[in-house]
Amino acid sequence: MKNRDIIVEAGSKVLRSTPRKLNLVADLVRNKKVSFANVQLRFCEKKAAGFIMKVLNSAIANAQNNYGLNVDNLYIKEILIGKSLTLRRVYPKAMGRANRMSKFYSNITIKLKEIV
């Protein structure tokens, strides 16, 4: 088994952002080289870009330290964004009524692979 068969993985759970917002940013860097993705995320002004960049840097560190892979040959094979828990809150309304407010959380998993 050569290094090119290795898939490096990193993830983060229970992030305070909705999956829809994270997917907008994740679509920018799917199937791109790691160096290009880092630049894209650094200059993206969305809060979700910071979350994805942290997980991407963790995956890069895993590739270097655990497998000894070269960063220049890595690309993002897969970015998985999933639903996590939902926090329910009560939102007071007029005339003694109340509505329910939901705060959504997400999970991220990034898989890197070496370019053949």
UniProtKB/Swiss-Prot annotation:
Gene3D superfamilies, alphabetized: Ribosomal protein L22/L17
Protein's UniProt keywords contain RNA-binding: yes
Molecular function GO labels: rRNA binding; structural constituent of ribosome
GO CC field: cytosolic large ribosomal subunit
Keyword annotations of the record: Ribonucleoprotein, Ribosomal protein, RNA-binding, rRNA-binding
One of the GO biological process terms: translation
Domain of life: Bacteria
Pfam families: Ribosomal_L22 (PF00237)
Protein task: This protein binds specifically to 23S rRNA; its binding is stimulated by other ribosomal proteins, e.g. L4, L17, and L20. It is important during the early stages of 50S assembly. It makes multiple contacts with different domains of the 23S rRNA in the assembled 50S subunit and ribosome.
Family: Belongs to the universal ribosomal protein uL22 family.
NCBIfam families (alphabetical): rplV_bact (TIGR01044)
Subunit structure: Part of the 50S ribosomal subunit.
Protein's name in the database: Large ribosomal subunit protein uL22
Organism this protein belongs to: Wolbachia pipientis subsp. Culex pipiens (strain wPip)
Lineage: Bacteria, Pseudomonadati, Pseudomonadota, Alphaproteobacteria, Rickettsiales
